[in-house]
Amino acid sequence: MFSKDKLPVILFLFLAGVINYLDRSALSIAAPFIQDDLTLSATQMGLIFSSFSIGYAIFNFLGGVASDRYGAKLTLFVAMVVWSLFSGAVALAFGFVSLLIIRILFGMGEGPLSATINKMVNNWFPPTQRASVIGVTNSGTPLGGAISGPIVGMIAVAFSWKVSFVLIMIIGLIWAVLWFKFVKEKPQETIKEAPAIKAETSPGEKIPLTFYLKQKTVLFTAFAFFAYNYILFFFLTWFPSYLVDERGLSVESMSVITVIPWILGFIGLAAGGFVSDYVYKKTARKGVLFSRKVVLVTCLFSSAVLIGFAGLVATTAGAVTLVALSVFFLYLTGAIYWAVIQDVVDQNNVGSVGGFMHFLANTAGIIGPALTGFIVDQTGTFSGAFLLAGGLAVFASLAVIRFVRPIIGKPAGTEAENPVSY
């Protein structure tokens, strides 16, 4: 399916995703220990979970701009070094404020990842493969979340939660050195394969970034991605604490059980891009966005219903099953948001527009965890938080049907006709 010279790029990007969520999930797994050691309330813990997304969301956009200007390879190298160092710095936290600051800086480091992956895929692969490649590379993230539970949980119980953050830092720094040494920005055959690999627009076209930032297709794709991230951050940050605090599980049991949704998420994200590309090939006459919307709306709506009901069931097994299925359907859409941007944006702007979309989407990571902590403190239960996450995603999936459409026309001063209407 993919040529041998491109497989290392896929592997490195996949492993970057694994490390990304190994780092990011570690705090959630270690949260019961950290809360006790630093004497933090649920509201304070929610603010710490949210603080990550303050730096993360801002650098989603700035990282995308940097990947367009300085190249995805260099941008991702710097990002990995920064986030690995601040992952290790979590072990130095001595209170609420210090941990809050470290998590903001850690989020800044992780921010450029998705936009740089999107840019690298755009550099290396033709449009017919991009959703599949994005799905495969991004599937590393739920796998990282899956292995984070057992690894961090066992290390925290056997040694200390601080040790796990130092080990994860070392893994990230090793990846950064190998990435910089072995991966190229673009394939050597780019010139020969230019008609297949580059975006539909020609190099001479100058379409301003602001043209895309005002398009409903970009804005409502970002809104759907916001709903996706609201569910994801709810699961990522609070689900371990929900199992321990509301369901009464031990940290050891929680560490094992959290693997189940992540494994289904890994399968969903890896398969989602292939499903979208397959639907596209079968419905090509209806346009590429039709296939993206079919997968996105169906799966996001299903995820929303499942997560909403998960907070209402009486048994732990039922709640875990519904959350796991919700994560599976959620991750089936994971590659689609990026594929939509690939489909409607020219090559010169794809990193920046993707970063802008990701920035808007990840404000959910600022709002969601803090709001969940507040809801839990006020009500003493997670039920309302589950229902809010599901309701938001239902609304977003319906908005996609109405507003995500091909971008027809061109901004004033460009030469191409309908450059992004395919």
From Swiss-Prot:
Major location category of this protein: membrane
Gene3D superfamilies: MFS general substrate transporter like domains
InterPro entries on file: MFS, MFS_dom, MFS_Na/Anion_cotransporter, MFS_trans_sf, Sugar_P_transporter
Pfam families: MFS_1
Sequence intervals crossing the membrane: 9-29, 45-65, 82-102, 141-161, 163-183, 219-239, 256-276, 294-314, 321-341, 356-376, 381-401
UniProt entry tagged with the keyword rRNA-binding: no
Zinc-finger found in the keyword field: no
Subcellular location: Cell membrane
GO cellular component: plasma membrane
Catalytic activity: aldehydo-D-glucuronate(in) + H(+)(in) = aldehydo-D-glucuronate(out) + H(+)(out); aldehydo-D-galacturonate(out) + H(+)(out) = aldehydo-D-galacturonate(in) + H(+)(in)
Membrane topology reported for the UniProt record: Multi-pass membrane protein
Molecular function (Gene Ontology), one example: transmembrane transporter activity
Matching PROSITE patterns: MFS
Annotated keywords: Cell membrane, Membrane, Transmembrane, Transmembrane helix, Transport
Induction of the gene: Induced by galacturonate, repressed by glucose.
Other remarks on this protein: Member of the exu locus which is required for galacturonate utilization.
NCBIfam families: 2A0114 (TIGR00893)
Family the UniProt entry places it in: Belongs to the major facilitator superfamily. Phthalate permease family.
Job of this protein: Transport of aldohexuronates such as D-glucuronate and D-galacturonate.
UniProt name for this protein: Hexuronate transporter
